[in-house]
């Protein structure tokens, strides 16, 4: 009878809750008594490429974490690389050395075949490369520009401005207005007439210069022939 009463008392909710509370307290005390291993805090790091053109800021807990994040950020999957200090090129290989470094330490990623170089040497090489790629100064001998525009939206073609520049010093421009079909023909005839007049002036100038040159050569030939004709006459008189 006593055994049955004890069994019923154990099944009573108050005693059951008391046993659960005691068990929870024991488990909690055991968990607290066990020494917990502290995880290192994330530290800020800066990483650059070998040419110092790309720089990234990364938060990493350990050296392995930093290497994994560098591989993901710089897309270096399946590419062997090493991590060195940016200031002097010291290789960072152990976790102890990584944890001993100061915060915001600048690291450099070197791929296979790349070597660490001081910043001064890289600046010198960049300056030489910039000077070698500097374009040489060019002088325009002649430049012709065409500008087509409309003064009225209803114009057939519009207006054409032709500008010619020689050695960036002498310039000549002509404005051709094209309003209607008849006006276009008139402007074309006017331009043709202007070209013919200019060509005629050039031909006249050239022909007059050639005429003067021919006249000068013809006057020199009789002058040379006169002394040769006087010599036989003098010989006859002496005989």
Curated annotation (Swiss-Prot):
Position of sequence motif RKKR polybasic motif: 123-126
Documented effect of changing residue 132 to A: Abolished ability to mediate lipid droplet fusion
InterPro entries the record matches: CIDE-N_dom (IPR003508)
Keyword terms of this UniProt record: Activator, Apoptosis, Endoplasmic reticulum, Lipid droplet, Lipid transport, Nucleus, Transcription, Transcription regulation, Transport, Ubl conjugation
Result when mutating residue 126 to A: Does not affect ability to mediate lipid droplet fusion
GO biological process terms held by the UniProt record: apoptotic process; execution phase of apoptosis; lipid droplet fusion; lipid storage; negative regulation of lipid catabolic process; negative regulation of triglyceride metabolic process
Result of altering residue 75 to A: Inhibits interaction with PLIN1
Listed result of changing residue 55 to E: Abolishes CIDE-N/CIDE-N interaction between the 2 homodimer subunits
Catalytic reaction equation(s): a triacyl-sn-glycerol(in) = a triacyl-sn-glycerol(out)
Protein's UniProt keywords contain Membrane: no
Task of the protein: Lipid transferase specifically expressed in white adipose tissue, which promotes unilocular lipid droplet formation by mediating lipid droplet fusion. Lipid droplet fusion promotes their enlargement, restricting lipolysis and favoring lipid storage. Localizes on the lipid droplet surface, at focal contact sites between lipid droplets, and mediates atypical lipid droplet fusion by undergoing liquid-liquid phase separation (LLPS) and promoting directional net neutral lipid transfer from the smaller to larger lipid droplets.
UniProt subunit comment: Homodimer. Homooligomer; undergoes liquid-liquid phase separation (LLPS) via its N-terminus, facilitating lipid droplet fusion, occurs at the lipid droplet contact sites. Interacts with CIDEA. Interacts with PLIN1. Interacts with NFAT5; this interaction is direct and retains NFAT5 in the cytoplasm. Interacts with CEBPB. Interacts with isoform CLSTN3beta of CLSTN3; inhibiting the lipid transferase activity of CIDEC.
Protein name: Lipid transferase CIDEC
Organism: Mus musculus (Mouse)
Gene that this polypeptide is encoded by: Cidec
């Amino acid at each position: 009878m006593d055994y049955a009463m004890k069994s019923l008392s154990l099944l009573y909710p108050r005693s059951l809750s008391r046993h659960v509370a005691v068990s929870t307290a024991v488990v909690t005390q055991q968990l607290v008594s066990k020494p917990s291993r502290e995880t290192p805090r994330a530290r800020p790091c800066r990483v650059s490429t070998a040419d110092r053109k790309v720089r990234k800021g990364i938060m990493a807990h350990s050296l392995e974490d930093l290497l994994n994040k560098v591989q993901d950020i710089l897309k270096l999957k399946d590419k062997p690389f090493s991590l060195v200090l940016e200031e002097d090129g010291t290789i960072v290989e152990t976790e102890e050395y990584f944890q001993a470094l100061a915060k915001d330490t600048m690291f450099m990623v070197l791929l296979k075949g790349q070597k660490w170089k001081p910043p001064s040497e890289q600046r010198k090489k960049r300056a030489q490369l910039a000077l070698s790629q500097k374009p040489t100064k060019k002088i325009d001998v002649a430049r012709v520009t065409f500008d087509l525009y409309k003064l009225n939206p209803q114009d057939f073609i519009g207006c054409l401005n032709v500008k010619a520049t020689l050695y960036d010093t002498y310039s000549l421009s002509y404005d051709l207005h094209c309003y209607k079909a008849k006006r276009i023909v008139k402007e074309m005839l006017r331009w043709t007439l202007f070209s013919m007049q200019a060509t005629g002036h050039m031909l006249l100038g050239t022909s007059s210069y050639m005429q003067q040159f021919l006249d000068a050569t013809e006057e020199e030939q009789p002058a040379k022939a006169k002394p040769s004709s006087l010599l036989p006459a003098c010989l006859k008189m002496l005989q």
